[in-house]
């Protein structure tokens, strides 16, 4: 791992779709990815449950549990070089660890939100936009999926 000793999350939320509307809540321990997956599995909803986590204004993680299936997405695979939580994420997702000379690219399941209306090309374009910080990328995802108002309320509370 690199020299990043302290990892701060800008925010970490879980969202689930039930009875035609989204509900969201803050995640208490965003570095404990196994616990997050267990929490998402407890949300037995028709649209599954999603965790969105931003780390140090550098990258974001997305985890989606739908039934027994778990999908993973990271906005920049090279962050696993410096961030232990990203390296653990890649291990859970069964993705190869990056090399020092790898390009900063998204990795994982680009179709993680396709059935909810956010297609892989749009997600990839969001991640490629150098003008957007990870929290802004997550806000765009929330807007596209339909829970931007709930996210704004949660972040302002």
Enumerate the language-model features and the residues they cover.
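Non-catalytic, solvent-exposed interaction/assembly segments
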Residues: 6-19
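Generic structural hydrophobic/aromatic packing signal, biased to beta-strands
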Residues: 12-14, 52, 89
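Compact, well-ordered interaction domains used in eukaryotic information-processing assemblies
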Residues: 2-4, 21-85
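Short amphipathic alpha-helical segments, especially helix-boundary/capping motifs
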Residues: 11-14, 36, 114-115
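Aromatic-enriched hydrophobic runs in primary sequence
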Residues: 17-19, 39, 100
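Charged, compositionally biased boundary regions
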Residues: 82-157
